[in-house]
């Protein structure tokens, strides 16, 4: 009997599910974490935190950034671009002056070259920081400023600036492009917009 061994197409793990519902950071929480990292001279983590907030990249893309993805020569560019692992679509991101300063300081301190991973792993078996390592580092940041780690995750980093941009502009298309989503509905679900708006209406209604 002939046996075929054609693998079935994989269904995305998050198909039909609400993902990314870990809370985004509030501006005051971003400032608090940044201040603590600066005070404690944790240059690697400061660069990782600031770039994570600015880039809005998924954890799997953030940890695989190479120096050349954000640097032109010995200077960090004002914009970066990366091919997303999940969608194989390119996405561009801005790099704010404060983040450029933090990343430049980290690159100099670590002696990184253009082809090096921006955040090398301290574990020998991996050339770059892993997503689990990143999640543990983030948990430390959350605890550092007295927040509950259960309420935050790597998607909190990705959602923070995207949520602020939407709240200030209500421009969903812009946020979709910044997050690299193929469909606008994905952005709506990711930000939890319909749920948040419904709750706000409910809170404003007395009976």
For each predicted feature, which ranges?
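Conserved catalytic core of the tyrosine transesterase superfamily
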Residues: 1-207
């Amino acid at each position: 009997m002939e046996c075929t061994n054609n693998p079935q197409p994989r269904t995305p793990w998050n198909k039909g599910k609400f993902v990314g519902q870990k809370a985004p950071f509030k501006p005051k929480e971003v400032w608090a974490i940044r201040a603590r990292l600066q005070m404690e001279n944790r240059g690697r983590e400061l660069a990782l935190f600031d770039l994570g907030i600015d880039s809005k990249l998924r954890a799997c893309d953030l940890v695989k950034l190479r120096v050349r993805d954000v640097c032109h020569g010995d200077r960090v560019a004002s914009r970066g671009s990366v091919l997303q692992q999940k969608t194989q679509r390119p996405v561009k991101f801005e790099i704010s002056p404060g983040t450029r300063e933090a990343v430049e300081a980290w690159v100099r301190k670590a002696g990184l070259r253009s082809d090096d991973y921006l955040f090398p792993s301290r574990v020998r078996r991996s050339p770059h920081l892993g997503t689990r390592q990143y999640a543990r580092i983030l948990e430390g940041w959350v605890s550092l400023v007295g927040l509950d780690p259960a309420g935050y995750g790597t998607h909190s980093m990705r959602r923070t600036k995207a949520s602020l941009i939407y709240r200030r502009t209500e421009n969903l298309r812009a946020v979709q492009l910044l997050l690299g989503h193929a469909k606008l509905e994905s952005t709506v679900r990711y930000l939890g917009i319909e749920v948040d708006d419904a709750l706000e209406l409910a809170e404003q209604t007395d009976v």
